[in-house]
């Protein structure tokens, strides 16, 4: 991609009200389906339905160009289908099962050519949806995919991810991580396209005909990652003005999520044809367990070990555990001290003061590590004083 821009030089007093670019190229008249998966978030998804209906589906300019498909994995939603809105009750098979059901239903609508996967809180501008649809209508390659960058909801000018990069078929890292979108230089950085491996389902738009495989309808964290892995032919791009605001993932660290996260990493590694992928997975596993253990997150470490064993149990495990009923019971049985749910805290409007112990000194850190957090020395040598650690300090060296 290159830059198209306007230079304006005024010879006298004048006002520039706006400008636009036009093309004589043929543009398809097909529609786009907005697919949302929700689970027991009635208030959020109802607000999203009403907002999209008011600003998009009932507007004369757009009403024939968009359809809304809401896949409900939880309790009934008080909203009827009709007028471009389809509400579908679905078995709770996670985000993957919900979005794949929405994709199947979108294929049944004759004039729908493109689909956007979106979060149920619809935390994006309507302009992002319109801009994405216009871009895909002009795309020459059916494998062109648009992913919206993710901005932090508590710091909305900072980018968490603008697409993600694959590393050795199973590790991945976010592109443009912590880029401040307010700077002029940031625009150049943002437009510096790289080979993106997958895009998050908080905003992921594509041509229906480019989808070769459905994702497995089972619970994983990062089901969008597996979907991207199965569609490596996709040419994933990002666009200025196409973004979504989301909660910081580090606030979602929990025992269950850590179990699911490791499964997400393990599956691509186990099916990869790359040499030593399984060995690298084992090294990654040992590293993550040690990091969690030295961070005093022992229940989280146990969940990772459980996940590792389950992933090596064969296909029967996946077939017998499509839902999370039995796995939740096992996770709950080992979770006693790490149940704190920071997702429910209003971090934008509320704050809590805690005594700060300061950053751990290097000598203390050294002794803590060589004594395995003090477990190798008698308990009476230890000062039993609780300390407060920032929720982001998953890594023990950040204490």
Q: Which ranges hold each PLM region?
A:
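N-proximal low-complexity "stem/linker" segments adjacent to membrane-targeting elements
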Residues: 1-50
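Terminal low-complexity segments of carbohydrate-biosynthetic enzymes
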Residues: 1-3, 8, 263-399
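Active-site donor/metal-binding and catalytic loop motifs
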Residues: 17-24, 235-255
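Acidic donor-binding segment of Leloir-type glycosyltransferases
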Residues: 51-88
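Short beta-strand-to-loop acidic/aromatic patch adjacent to the donor-nucleotide binding site
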Residues: 111-123
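Conserved donor NDP-sugar-binding/catalytic core segment of glycosyltransferases
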Residues: 127-173
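A recurrent flexible, glycine/aromatic-enriched loop bordering the glycosyltransferase active site
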Residues: 177-203, 252
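Donor nucleotide-sugar recognition loop
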Residues: 198-203, 212-229, 234-239, 256
């Amino acid at each position: 991609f290159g830059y198209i821009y306007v230079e304006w030089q005024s010879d006298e007093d004048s006002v520039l009200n706006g400008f636009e670019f036009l093309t004589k190229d043929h543009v398809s008249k097909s529609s786009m389906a907005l697919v949302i998966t929700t689970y027991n978030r009635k208030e959020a998804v109802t607000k999203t339905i009403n907002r999209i209906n008011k600003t998009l589906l009932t507007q004369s300019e757009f009403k024939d160009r968009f359809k809304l498909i809401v896949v409900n994995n939880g309790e009934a939603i008080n909203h009827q289908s009709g007028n471009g809105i389809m509400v579908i009750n679905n078995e709770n098979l996670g985000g993957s099962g919900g979005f794949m059901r929405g994709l199947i239903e979108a294929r049944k609508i004759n004039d729908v050519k493109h689909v956007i996967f979106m979060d149920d809180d619809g935390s994006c501008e309507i302009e992002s949806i319109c801009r994405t649809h216009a871009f895909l209508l002009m795309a020459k390659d059916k494998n062109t995919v648009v992913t919206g960058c993710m901005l932090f909801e508590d710091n909305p000018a900072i980018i968490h991810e603008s697409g993600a990069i694959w590393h050795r078929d199973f590790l991945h890292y976010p592109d443009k991580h912590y880029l401040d979108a307010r700077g002029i230089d940031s625009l150049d950085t943002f437009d510096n396209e790289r080979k993106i491996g997958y895009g998050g389902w908080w905003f992921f738009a594509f041509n229906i005909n480019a989808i070769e495989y459905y994702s497995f309808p089972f619970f994983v964290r990062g089901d969008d990652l597996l979907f991207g892995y199965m569609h490596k032919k996709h040419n994933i791009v990002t666009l200025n003005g196409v973004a979504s605001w989301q909660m910081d993932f580090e606030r979602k660290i929990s025992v269950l999520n850590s179990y699911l996260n490791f499964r997400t990493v393990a599956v691509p590694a186990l099916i990869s044809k790359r040499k030593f992928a399984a060995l690298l997975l084992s090294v990654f596993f040992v590293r993550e367990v040690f990091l969690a253990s030295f961070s005093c997150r022992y229940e989280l470490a146990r969940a990772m070990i459980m996940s590792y064993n389950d992933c090596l149990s064969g296909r029967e495990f996946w077939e017998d555990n499509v839902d999370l009923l039995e796995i939740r019971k096992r996770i709950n049985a080992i979770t006693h001290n790490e149940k704190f749910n920071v997702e429910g805290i209003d971090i934008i409007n509320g704050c809590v003061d805690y005594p700060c112990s300061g950053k751990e000194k290097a000598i203390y850190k050294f002794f803590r590590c060589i004594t395995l957090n003090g477990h190798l020395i008698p308990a009476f040598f230890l000062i039993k004083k609780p300390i407060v650690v920032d929720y982001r300090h998953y890594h023990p060296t950040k204490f």
